[in-house]
Each structure stands twice: as C-alpha cells, then as structure tokens.
C-alpha cells in the first residue's frame, strides 16, 4: 500500500521539490500552496487551475490532512478551544483568543512536555511525542478556515483574515521540537501561504539556549521567554531546565537574539505565585538581572491558574499590581495578562485539560472510530472548508 504524502508537512522549497518529482514545474507548487494555505482546500478536484493530470497524480499520491477535531468549546469571553487528535492516543489543544483589532491563535508543538515546570499543568501529564509539521501548521489551517466557515467568510485572500497573530505558547517546548517548528514558522510567514509578519508570530521558550541562537539564524520571529524567577536558586525549582541553562547564559542568548529579531525587545513571561516569586525584592532582582545583561525587554505578568497537583496559589491582585509598579518605576514596560478562557481550561498553564485523563481520550477516539465506520471516514472531521 502506497503511503500518501501529507502536503501540510512540506515547506515551500519541499513542495517545489515534490512537484518536481511528479514532473511538474515550480509554479505548480505555488498554485498548490495557495489552494492549501489560502483557500483551506483539501480536495484536489477543487483546485481548478491545476492541470487535470496533476490533480489525478495528487489524488493517488498525496493528502491534505490536519489533526481531527475531538472537541470544540467556546468560553463566555469568546475564547475558543479545540482538542485535536494527533494519533496514538495523544491529543493537543489549540486556543483562539479574539480581541477587538486582532485574533490570536495559541498553538501546541508537542503532545505533553518534558520541561515539567512546576506551575504548568501540561508538564504534569509527561512527554508523549513531538508533533509533525502538518500537526503544527495544521492547527492554524484548521482554525483559520473553521473560524471563517463559522462566520460565513469566504476562503482565499479576499476573505477577512481571522487569525492575525500566532503564539507558540501551547503544549510543549517549541525549541525541543526544532525542525517541525521552524518549518511551520516559515509557512506562517510565507506570502504565498499565510503571509504573517515576523512581528506577529511569537515563539515562547523556557530557555533552550543553543536553540535560541539557532532560531535567530533560521527564522527570527518575536521571542518570549518563560522566566518566572529572579535568581537561579528559585528558577531551578520552578523551571528545571534552568539547571542546564542558568540565567546568565539565558540572558546572554536573549541579547544575541535581538540582533536578528523583528522586535527590539524580548518579552519575559512571569507567572505570579503567592509567596514564592512575587515580593518587591524579587521585582528588584529582576530589574538588576536585565540591567546587568543589558537586555531590552518587557514583562508580562501572568496570574497563576491553579490546578490540584501544583501545591501553588495565585498571587492576590494587589500584590500583582504592586509588583508591576516596582518594575514600571524602573522604566520597564510591564503588562498583566488578562485571564481568558479559564472556564474551558484554555487559560495560560491549563493546557492539559481532557488530555490529562488518557482513558477518556481513548474512549472518545474509540467512539469516533465507531461513528466513522458507520457513517464514513470523514465523520466528525474538518476535511473541506474551501467550498
């Protein structure tokens, strides 16, 4: 049986090479890429400006398949969360956050996470596997065209774009799944695909120093760093990766990255934990840390979203405001992240949700297989959004 090539796995250069293997010229790859990423098409017969001979070849050798949607929930504040099947009993979550002038999609890069930050529920489920390119970019593909379909907006460049910003802040550490992550980033930025600005795509890392340097050369998008502590002793306990890449190395990597970044600052994410990292002294240590390293930055303070296994609690709002004020008085731009989607477990640090209960996921997948056997393989799947 011939293995079908998932065209969502291919970046622009790879798609040109693939078309070359089929005896086609490079311009066919560009046409194909537009159909896939600008029109959301998965049916080759719908790609009417492709030669029929090419469509026939593709129908027997290729497929366009994003992860199937297991569940779809919308929060009272408009935040929308999809649980998607990435196979072998694994599922990841994708979250859309609508705002007045933009729509941000938070995507996952791994099923589970090996970093195991103390305050993050995703890490508590352990690491299962890396996602493929198609599973990463497929989250954007699925979400963009599902949002358009929901609102009755036509596919293609003329239709109003629903996702204007992408943040790699979902499940997993992006820089520990480097090649698929970078390939997906390149597709996001390509004008023949999604055409997003580098300033509107943010990768968040817990601090994999060598890969930060590599990213600066391969695909320098906006950088966010999960900092969460003002000194090594504290960060060792909250972010175990710090034992391998301590703060002095991380700060130096951030400074090097800014030579190539689309923004002139790094965003430091800081989860506010009551009695752990939220004192004025911690804030003063942060000021000294970034000044000594000479890293232009802004801080995004994140109210902790509690979960039972953490043993941690959220800092009180007055404490968060006081902490922010210390930073701002030192001239550091500081924001406090709004808590969005917490009623559907879509808020920051909560992306384990239904995935954490592996038995329930297996039950849902078994039930889905039964329905597909009865009603056809496409039951419950978003397979064609171009019509």
UniProtKB/Swiss-Prot annotation:
Subcellular location(s) per record: Cytoplasm
SUPFAM superfamilies, per database record: Radical SAM enzymes
Annotated InterPro entries: Aldolase_TIM, Methyltransferase_A, RlmN_N, RNA_MTrfase_RlmN, rRNA_lsu_MTrfase_RlmN/Cfr, rSAM
Residues annotated as transmembrane: none
Phylogenetic placement of the source organism: Bacteria, Pseudomonadati, Pseudomonadota, Betaproteobacteria, Burkholderiales
Enzyme's top EC category: transferase
Described function: Specifically methylates position 2 of adenine 2503 in 23S rRNA and position 2 of adenine 37 in tRNAs. m2A2503 modification seems to play a crucial role in the proofreading step occurring at the peptidyl transferase center and thus would serve to optimize ribosomal fidelity.
Disulfide bridge map: 106-348
More about this protein: Reaction proceeds by a ping-pong mechanism involving intermediate methylation of a conserved cysteine residue.
This protein's UniProt keywords: 4Fe-4S, Cytoplasm, Disulfide bond, Iron, Iron-sulfur, Metal-binding, Methyltransferase, rRNA processing, S-adenosyl-L-methionine, Transferase, tRNA processing
Cytoplasm found in the keyword field: yes
Catalytic activity, reaction form: adenosine(2503) in 23S rRNA + 2 reduced [2Fe-2S]-[ferredoxin] + 2 S-adenosyl-L-methionine = 2-methyladenosine(2503) in 23S rRNA + 5'-deoxyadenosine + L-methionine + 2 oxidized [2Fe-2S]-[ferredoxin] + S-adenosyl-L-homocysteine; adenosine(37) in tRNA + 2 reduced [2Fe-2S]-[ferredoxin] + 2 S-adenosyl-L-methionine = 2-methyladenosine(37) in tRNA + 5'-deoxyadenosine + L-methionine + 2 oxidized [2Fe-2S]-[ferredoxin] + S-adenosyl-L-homocysteine
Parts forming coiled coils: none
Annotated Radical SAM core domain residues: 99-343
One Pfam family this sequence matches: Radical_SAM
Residues the record lists as binding [4Fe-4S] cluster: 113, 117, 120
Catalytic residues identified in the record: 93 (proton acceptor), 348 (s-methylcysteine intermediate)
Co-factor requirement: [4Fe-4S] cluster
Similarity field: Belongs to the radical SAM superfamily. RlmN family.
Binding site for S-adenosyl-L-methionine: 172-173, 204, 226-228, 305
Record's protein name: Dual-specificity RNA methyltransferase RlmN
């Amino acid at each position: 049986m011939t293995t079908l090539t998932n065209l969502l796995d291919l970046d622009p250069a790879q798609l040109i090479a693939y078309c070359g293997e089929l005896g086609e010229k490079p311009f066919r790859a560009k046409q194909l890429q537009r159909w896939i990423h600008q029109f959301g098409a998965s049916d080759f017969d719908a790609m009417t400006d492709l030669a029929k001979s090419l469509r026939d070849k593709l129908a027997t050798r290729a497929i366009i398949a994003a992860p199937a949607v297991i569940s779809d929930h919308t929060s009272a504040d408009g935040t929308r969360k999809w649980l998607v099947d990435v196979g072998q009993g694994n599922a990841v979550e994708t979250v859309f956050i609508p705002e007045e002038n933009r729509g941000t999609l938070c995507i996952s890069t791994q099923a589970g996470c090996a970093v195991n930050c103390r305050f993050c529920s995703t890490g508590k489920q352990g690491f299962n596997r890396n996602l493929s390119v198609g599973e990463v970019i497929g989250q954007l593909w699925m979400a963009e065209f599902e949002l358009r379909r929901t609102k009755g907006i036509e596919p293609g460049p003329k239709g109003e774009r629903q996702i204007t910003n992408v943040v790699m802040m979902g499940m997993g550490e992006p820089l520990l799944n480097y090649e698929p992550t970078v390939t997906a980033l390149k597709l996001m930025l390509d004008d023949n695909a999604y055409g997003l600005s580098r300033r509107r795509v943010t990768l968040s890392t817990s601090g994999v120093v060598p890969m930060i340097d590599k990213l600066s050369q391969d695909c320098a998008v906006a950088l966010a760093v999960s900092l969460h502590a003002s000194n090594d002793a504290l960060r060792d306990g909250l972010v175990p990766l710090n034992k391998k890449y301590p703060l002095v190395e991380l700060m130096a990597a951030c400074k090097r990255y800014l030579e190539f970044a689309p923004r002139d600052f790094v965003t430091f994410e800081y989860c506010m934990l009551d009695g752990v990292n939220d004192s004025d002294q911690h804030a003063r240590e942060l000021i000294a840390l970034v000044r000594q390293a000479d890293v232009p930055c802004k801080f995004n303070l994140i109210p902790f979203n509690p979960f039972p296994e953490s043993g941690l609690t959220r800092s009180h709002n007055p404490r968060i405001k006081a902490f922010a004020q210390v930073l701002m008085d030192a001239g550091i731009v500081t924001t406090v992240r709004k808590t969005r989607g917490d009623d559907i477990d879509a808020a920051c640090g909560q992306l384990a949700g239904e995935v954490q209960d592996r038995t329930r996921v297996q039950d849902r997948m078994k039930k889905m297989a039964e329905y597909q056997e009865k009603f056809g393989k496409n039951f419950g799947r978003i397979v064609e959004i171009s019509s």
